[in-house]
């Protein structure tokens, strides 16, 4: 069966496969900001983001988190479970940064006494507006049980990854997760990716940015930054 492009996103493409319950995901050498309004090419960025996400997903799977990941196909490709995506972003904030800082007039870098949990409706034309549980349920984006399961997974991910990144000399400032209903059984699982494209990472000593903010703020080379994140994580895991 000929593969067909199912979805072309800001940093990835999803392709059909011979198995109707599986997809091929391709990580692209590009980065966007302003909800895709500004796009730039970065050689090697797709492979670097892919390497980080695969490493993190393997770690999460080893610790009991269900994800869409099946296997690596190439330096920029994975085979994943097909999912009907929940149109929500689940954002966990451990430290004040980005829009959260500007929205509330707070200083970046301020530690939060507990993780802040926020949801946003995934719609580029609407600039991904904030949404709460009652609205998401009323609009039939998710059921109450699914919403609770997504947040339970987010909390597990935070508890697992915060110490891992600390061991690698990085502070997990915040991150955004996405979930889907697995095609073969309708089970909610972690999907999309986990890379500096969808989280903020700061060096624990210098507080230098090690994420997509280096592109947003023109601070450093994006691909080299992602490669450094991967090298640090790989070294931290080898110490276990």
UniProtKB/Swiss-Prot annotation:
Keyword flag Transmembrane helix: no
GO molecular function (one): phosphoribosylaminoimidazolesuccinocarboxamide synthase activity
Reaction it catalyzes: 5-amino-1-(5-phospho-D-ribosyl)imidazole-4-carboxylate + L-aspartate + ATP = (2S)-2-[5-amino-1-(5-phospho-beta-D-ribosyl)imidazole-4-carboxamido]succinate + ADP + phosphate + 2 H(+)
Primary enzyme class: ligase
Pathway: Purine metabolism; IMP biosynthesis via de novo pathway; 5-amino-1-(5-phospho-D-ribosyl)imidazole-4-carboxamide from 5-amino-1-(5-phospho-D-ribosyl)imidazole-4-carboxylate: step 1/2
Its EC number(s): 6.3.2.6
Entry-linked Gene3D superfamilies: ATP-grasp fold, B domain, Phosphorylase Kinase, domain 1
PROSITE patterns associated with the record: SAICAR_SYNTHETASE_2
CDD domains noted in UniProt: SAICAR_synt_PurC (cd01415)
Region forming the signal peptide: none
Coiled-coil spans in chain: none
Pfam family, one: SAICAR_synt
Superkingdom: Bacteria
GO biological process, any: cobalamin biosynthetic process
Keywords, alphabetical: ATP-binding, Ligase, Nucleotide-binding, Purine biosynthesis
PANTHER family membership: MULTIFUNCTIONAL PROTEIN ADE2 (PTHR43599), SI:DKEY-6E2.2 (PTHR43599:SF3)
Similarity comment: Belongs to the SAICAR synthetase family.
Protein name, as recorded: Phosphoribosylaminoimidazole-succinocarboxamide synthase
Organism: Limosilactobacillus fermentum (strain NBRC 3956 / LMG 18251)
């Amino acid at each position: 069966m000929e593969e067909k492009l199912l979805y072309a996103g800001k940093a990835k493409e999803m392709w059909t496969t011979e198995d109707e319950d599986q997809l091929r995901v391709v990580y692209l050498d590009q980065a966007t900001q302003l909800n895709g309004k500004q796009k730039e090419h970065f050689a090697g960025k797709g492979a670097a983001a892919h390497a980080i996400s695969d490493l993190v997903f393997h770690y999460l799977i080893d610790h009991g988190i269900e994800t869409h990941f099946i296997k690596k196909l190439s330096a920029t490709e994975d085979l994943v479970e097909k999912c009907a995506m929940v149109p929500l972003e689940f954002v966990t904030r451990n430290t004040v940064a980005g829009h959260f800082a500007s929205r509330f007039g707070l200083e970046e870098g301020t530690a939060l006494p507990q993780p802040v949990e926020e949801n946003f409706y995934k719609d580029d034309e609407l600039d991904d507006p904030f949404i709460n549980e009652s609205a998401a349920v009323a609009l039939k984006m998710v059921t109450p049980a699914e919403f609770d399961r997504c947040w339970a997974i987010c909390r597990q991910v935070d508890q697992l990854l915060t110490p891992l990144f600390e061991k690698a000399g990085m502070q997990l400032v915040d991150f955004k997760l996405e979930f889907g209903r697995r095609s073969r059984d309708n089970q909610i699982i972690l999907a999309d990716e986990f890379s500096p494209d969808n989280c903020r990472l700061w060096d624990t000593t210098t507080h230098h940015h090690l994420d997509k903010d280096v592109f947003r703020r023109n601070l450093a080379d994006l691909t080299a930054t992602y490669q450094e994140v991967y090298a640090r994580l790989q070294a931290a895991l080898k110490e276990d």
